[in-house]
């Protein structure tokens, strides 16, 4: 099994990336249904998700799209509504937050660079 940073495996990176893309795909579908989205954005999300699931290389546009999405998710870890600049209450919460941050960082490195 390939290890990335802090013990995050390639499979964990792929699972987190697919999960983030699936959430975004659902958002894109809803936006398009409500008239606020675009077919191009939906198709870009779909093609990126398909390639990540099949472990195919991404083109430059897909890399940029995925990088922006993962950077957004990474920033929400620390700048989201529930985060107030405080250290998490428990070591388990801190460990979970750090692992998630390492996973998104590893995904950016693996898929987008």
Swiss-Prot record:
Record's protein name: Putative gene 57 protein
Organism classification: Viruses, Duplodnaviria, Heunggongvirae, Uroviricota, Caudoviricetes
Domain of life: Viruses
């Amino acid at each position: 099994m390939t290890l990335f940073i802090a013990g995050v495996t390639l499979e964990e990176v792929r699972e987190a990336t697919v999960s983030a893309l699936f959430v975004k795909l659902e958002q894109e579908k809803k936006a398009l249904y409500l008239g606020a989205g675009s077919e191009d954005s939906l198709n870009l999300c779909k093609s990126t998700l398909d390639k990540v699931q099949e472990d195919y290389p991404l083109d430059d546009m897909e890399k940029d799209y995925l990088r922006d999405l993962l950077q957004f998710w990474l920033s929400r870890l620390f700048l989201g509504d529930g985060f107030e600049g405080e250290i998490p209450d428990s070591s388990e919460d801190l460990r979970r937050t750090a692992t998630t941050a390492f996973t998104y960082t590893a995904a950016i490195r693996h898929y987008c660079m």
